[in-house]
C-alpha cells in the first residue's frame, strides 16, 4: 500500500492527467480555417457597418448553428449587429465573447480579432459535449474598434439575464507574441474581482500565464461593459505586436499551434468555472494578484534583453522601474510601467502615450533627466511643427539646471 504522502502525490498526478484528457484536443486546422476566412481580403477588414462585417456576422451565425446553437442577431443601428448563440437549457451560463469587427480596408485584423472569434467557436465545439452543469453563450461583438459599442449595447440590452452569468470570458488580440518577443505570454486579467475565479486561475497557473489587474491597461476591450454591470469576468489576450492595427496583421502570421495550446488551457479553466459549487461573486474591492510585480519585472527583463533596438528613453525608464518595483507597491507605478510597455509595443500610440502619460509622470516625480529623455523620444513621432517646437522648449527647460 502506498504511504500517505506518495498516495497523495499519485492522486494529484492522476487528477492532473484526467483534467488534460477531459477536453479533446483543440483543432489547429479549424482555428486556422476560421481566421483565414475572416481575415481574407474579400472581407475588406470587417469595419463595422460594411459588407465585409456583415459577411463575417453571417459566417459566425452559420458556424454557431452548425454547432447546435440557438442563434439570435442583435441589431443596434448603423448596420451593426452582435451575433449571439446559446447551447444548453440550464438557467446559469458561461459567456464566451470576442469582437469580430476589424480596422477596415487594407488591414486584415487577423489576431485582432479574427483569432479571438476562432477561439470561441473552437471552445464551443470542444465544451458542448462535456455535460457541464451550465449553458454556454457565445457572443460575437460588432463595433469594438470604435469604442466597445457592441458589448456596451449588449450589457444594456442582454438577451439573457446578466445575473445568471457564471462568468464572462472575453478574448481579444490572440495568436501573436507580445511585442514579437521569442517567448510567449498569455495575459489573464479580471481575476482580482472574484475570489472564485482567482482560485480557478491559480489552480491552472503555469509560468507563461501572467495574471495582472485590469486597471493596469484600462477599459481597452469588451470586458469593460461586463465589469460595469458587476459580472465576474476573465480577459485573455496575447497582447499587442508590431503589426497591431496595421496591414501586417495577417492570417499567415498567427501561430495556430500556440493558439490551440492556450485554447486548451482556457477550456480547462472554463470547465472549472462551470463546475463551481457556488457562483462567482463580483467584489467591489479588488484583490490584486500577489505575483503581479514579478510579472511586470519579468516582462521588463525580457524586453530589455531581446530588444537590441530599445530606445534610450525606454532603457532609462525600464531600469528605473525595475529598481523601484522592488520596494514601491503603489498602483500608480505599476500602471506607469505597464503604460511604458504598451507604448513600446504599439508604435502608432507610442508618441501619444510618451507625451501625455510617461513624460508628465516623471515631471511630477521631479525626475527631470528622465522626463527630458522621454520627450526626446516623443519628438521622433511628432510631425506637427508647433507641437515639435513645444516639445523642444520643454526639453530645453528640463535640461537647464534649476537654481538651488
Q: Could you say what each language-model-derived stretch is?
A:
Residues 34-36, 45-88:
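A non-catalytic alpha/beta surface segment that caps or lines the substrate-entry region
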Residues 85, 94-147, 266:
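Alpha-helical metal-binding/catalytic segments enriched in His/Glu/Asp
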Residues 90, 132, 141-235, 255-256, ...:
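Metal-dependent peptidase/peptidase-like ectodomains
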Residues 242-292:
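His/Asp/Glu-rich mid-to-C-terminal helical/loop segments that flank catalytic regions of hydrolases
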Residues 280-344:
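Acidic, Ser/Thr-rich low-complexity intrinsically disordered segments
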Amino acid at each position: 500500500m502506498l504511504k500517505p504522502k506518495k498516495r497523495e502525490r499519485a492522486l494529484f498526478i492522476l487528477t492532473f492527467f484526467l483534467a488534460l484528457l477531459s477536453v479533446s484536443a483543440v483543432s489547429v486546422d479549424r482555428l486556422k480555417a476560421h481566421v483565414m476566412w475572416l481575415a481574407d481580403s474579400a472581407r475588406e477588414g470587417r469595419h463595422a457597418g460594411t459588407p465585409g462585417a456583415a459577411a463575417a456576422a453571417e459566417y459566425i451565425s452559420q458556424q454557431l448553428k452548425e454547432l447546435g446553437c440557438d442563434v439570435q442577431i442583435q441589431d443596434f443601428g448603423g448596420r451593426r449587429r452582435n451575433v449571439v448563440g446559446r447551447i444548453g437549457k440550464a438557467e446559469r451560463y458561461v459567456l464566451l465573447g470576442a469582437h469580430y469587427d476589424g480596422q477596415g480596408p487594407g488591414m486584415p485584423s487577423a489576431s485582432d480579432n479574427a483569432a479571438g472569434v476562432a477561439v470561441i467557436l473552437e471552445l464551443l465545439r470542444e465544451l458542448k459535449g462535456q455535460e457541464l452543469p451550465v449553458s454556454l453563450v457565445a457572443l460575437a461583438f460588432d463595433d469594438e474598434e470604435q469604442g466597445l459599442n457592441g458589448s456596451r449595447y449588449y450589457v444594456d440590452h442582454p438577451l439573457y439575464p446578466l445575473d445568471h452569468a457564471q462568468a464572462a470570458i472575453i478574448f481579444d488580440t490572440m495568436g501573436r507574441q507580445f511585442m514579437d518577443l521569442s517567448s510567449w505570454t498569455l495575459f489573464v486579467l479580471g481575476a482580482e474581482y472574484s475570489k472564485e475565479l482567482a482560485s480557478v486561475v491559480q489552480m491552472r497557473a503555469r509560468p507563461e500565464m501572467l495574471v495582472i489587474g485590469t486597471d493596469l491597461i484600462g477599459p481597452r476591450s469588451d470586458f469593460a461593459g461586463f465589469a460595469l454591470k458587476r459580472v465576474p469576468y476573465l480577459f485573455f489576450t496575447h497582447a499587442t505586436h508590431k503589426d497591431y492595427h496595421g496591414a501586417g496583421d495577417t492570417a499567415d502570421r498567427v501561430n495556430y499551434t500556440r493558439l490551440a495550446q492556450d485554447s486548451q488551457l482556457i477550456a480547462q479553466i472554463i470547465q472549472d468555472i462551470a463546475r463551481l459549487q457556488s457562483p462567482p461573486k463580483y467584489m467591489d474591492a479588488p484583490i490584486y494578484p500577489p505575483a503581479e510585480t514579478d510579472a511586470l519585472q519579468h516582462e521588463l527583463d525580457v524586453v530589455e534583453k531581446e530588444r537590441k533596438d530599445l530606445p534610450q528613453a525606454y532603457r532609462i525608464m525600464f531600469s528605473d522601474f525595475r529598481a523601484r518595483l522592488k520596494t514601491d507597491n503603489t498602483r500608480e507605478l505599476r500602471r506607469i510601467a505597464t503604460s511604458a510597455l504598451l507604448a513600446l509595443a504599439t508604435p502608432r500610440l507610442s508618441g501619444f502615450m510618451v507625451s501625455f502619460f510617461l513624460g508628465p509622470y516623471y515631471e511630477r516625480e521631479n525626475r527631470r533627466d528622465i522626463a527630458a529623455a522621454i520627450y526626446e523620444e516623443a519628438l521622433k513621432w511628432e510631425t506637427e511643427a508647433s507641437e515639435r517646437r513645444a516639445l523642444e522648449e520643454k526639453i530645453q527647460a528640463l535640461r537647464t539646471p534649476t537654481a538651488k
